């Protein structure tokens, strides 16, 4: 495999497990951390072989399958996490900035409207991509525009309207890497903002298994329903496949109890989908992203294939 000449770092057969919150999954065939946007653009322009590209954020809302990821997995590092202000007074934030870090920056600088980010694991880029939300707010409510690059190496800008936000998603082209996000600035009171952040943290601590190996909410809420209630009603609280289980504390969270495989987690989610559909007639849609190849070894080890709703 002839890789493009870059300033950043390549690693072959790179273990991604330690980068994910679930602590499961296989290796990246090629792992690439660009130095800056120009380095990333150079890689994309030179990618004449059209090597498959996968982008990787904080690893919080993702299952990497046990067979790993083919092609090049791109992770934007600290050089893509800066926070600053535009000439017209908006916030401009690198896509690899953690949601919590932006929430804290806004609290210190008395900027309101970002408190909900303290309750959402992951990065700004990932949050924009899935229109993440919690406690009555979503990214679409605060975003002005994004700066991105497509897989051909072209820099592009999309306004809030052009992004086409929807519940836990958007209508952006699939061959796009978000580089920066620009947000509205509304002044507030630092003490009031901190109080609200503390409320959110307290609520999370009491209702979510935040100290476990988990990936956040497993399923998006169907319109008019709460996923956790449907899962609980189907009798699946605490249900277990191998070392993967449904949280006793919050039924819309899966947990790796120590040695779960990615297949066990994905099988558990698919089984929950099936049982909820049988119980209520409602299909739950995955909120956790599943990427990579299924390992043939995992199929042999697990032994059972479960029916998956199409």
Swiss-Prot record:
Cellular compartment(s): Cytoplasm
Entry's Gene Ontology cellular component terms: cytosol
The GO terms describing molecular function are: FAD binding; UDP-N-acetylmuramate dehydrogenase activity
Classify the source by domain of life. Bacteria
Q: Which UniProt keywords apply?
A: Cell cycle, Cell division, Cell shape, Cell wall biogenesis/degradation, Cytoplasm, FAD, Flavoprotein, NADP, Oxidoreductase, Peptidoglycan synthesis
Query: Which residues are named in the active-site annotation?
Result: 168, 217 (proton donor), 287
* Purpose: Cell wall formation.
PANTHER family (alphabetical): UDP-N-ACETYLENOLPYRUVOYLGLUCOSAMINE REDUCTASE
Give the protein name, as stated in the record. Answer: UDP-N-acetylenolpyruvoylglucosamine reductase
Q: Upper taxonomic classification of the species?
A: Bacteria, Pseudomonadati, Pseudomonadota, Alphaproteobacteria, Rickettsiales
């Amino acid at each position: 495999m002839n890789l493009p000449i870059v300033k950043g770092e390549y690693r072959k057969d790179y273990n991604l497990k330690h980068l994910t919150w679930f602590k499961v999954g296989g290796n990246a065939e090629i792992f690439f951390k660009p130095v800056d946007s120009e380095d990333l653009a150079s890689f994309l322009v030179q990618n004449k072989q059209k090597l498959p590209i996968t982008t990787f954020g904080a690893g919080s809302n993702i299952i990497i399958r046990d067979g790993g990821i083919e092609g090049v997995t791109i992770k934007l590092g600290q050089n893509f996490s800066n926070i600053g202000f535009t000439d017209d007074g908006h916030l401009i934030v690198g896509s690899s900035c953690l949601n919590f870090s932006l929430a804290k920056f806004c609290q210190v600088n008395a900027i309101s409207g970002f408190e909900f980010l303290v309750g959402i694991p992951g990065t700004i880029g990932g949050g924009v991509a899935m229109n993440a939300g919690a406690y009555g707010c979503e990214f679409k409510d605060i975003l002005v525009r994004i700066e991105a690059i497509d897989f051909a190496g072209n820099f592009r800008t999309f306004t809030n309207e052009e992004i086409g936000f929807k519940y836990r998603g958007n209508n952006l082209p699939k061959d796009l890497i978000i580089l920066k996000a620009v947000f509205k600035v509304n002044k507030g009171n630092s003490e009031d903002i901190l109080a609200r952040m503390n409320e959110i943290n307290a609520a999370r601590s009491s209702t979510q298994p935040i100290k476990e190996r988990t990936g956040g909410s497993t399923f998006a809420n169907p319109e008019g329903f709460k996923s956790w209630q449907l899962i609980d009603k189907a009798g699946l609280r605490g249900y277990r496949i191998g070392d993967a289980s449904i949280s006793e504390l919050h039924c819309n969270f899966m947990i790796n109890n120590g040695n779960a495989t990615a297949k066990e987690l994905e099988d558990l989610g698919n089984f929950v989908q099936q049982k909820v559909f049988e119980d209520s007639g409602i299909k739950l849609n995955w909120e956790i992203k599943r990427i990579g190849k299924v390992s043939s070894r995992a199929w042999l080890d697990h032994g059972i294939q479960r029916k998956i709703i199409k």
